[in-house]
Amino acid sequence: MMRRILRLLACGAVVLSLVACTPTGRAVGDTQDSMPSVAHDSTHKTDITVGFVGSTDTAADKKAIDALADDTLNVYYASLDTSGDSETADKIAATAQQGITDFVDRAVKIVIISGIDVTDANRDSWNQALTNVREAGIPVALLNPKHAPEDELLYAAILNTDDAASAKSVSIADAVITITRDEPHDRTIAVATE
């Protein structure tokens, strides 16, 4: 009987710890509307690990990854390894979702998903994969999404590349650092990868 009670208490503690990682009504990495009045020591950029889920546009992925790495961020890459037209959208989504699961297990500081394409056929599996990231307390940024998830609680920001480097764009590394540190930011950010 005592073992059952201890197991029940342990399960309750696990559930509470998971719930504590998810902000109410806000996406992980998008909870601040203003900078705190008291300065704090935040995560140093060399301690930020980025889980980068690739897209079918490997050239664009390479530019983004190189820009992140050039700014001393540690990037782990999950390639979709597609062979072209023979790959179905569902298989591509499943491969990307497996990469997300791997990054949660690796405990990265942020997950970037390049070219996400949420369709009616894969909506539930995307929602589940992104919910798992949310419950782990890891922010998600969508880079050049084709179709983003409807639930905006599943991602902190959309990053759109602006390689013309207009006055409105920021470096992709600066955007990622801002999201990771949970500093105030727009929901859609123009980023430069060059």
Tell me what each language-model feature is.
Residues 142-161:
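Glycine-rich, charge-decorated loop segments at or immediately adjacent to ligand/cofactor-binding or catalytic sites
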Residues 156-194:
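Extracellularly exposed regions in secreted/surface proteins, prominently low-complexity, repeat-rich
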Residues 19-26:
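Bacterial signal peptide processing site
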Residues 112-114, 137-148:
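Short beta-strand elements of ligand-binding domains
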Residues 95-109, 129:
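Short, well-structured alpha-helical segments in soluble
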Residues 122-140:
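Catalytic-core regions built around general acid/base machinery
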Residues 1-19:
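Sec-dependent bacterial lipoprotein signal peptides
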Residues 70-86:
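Short beta-strand elements in bilobed, periplasmic/extracellular small-molecule ligand-binding domains
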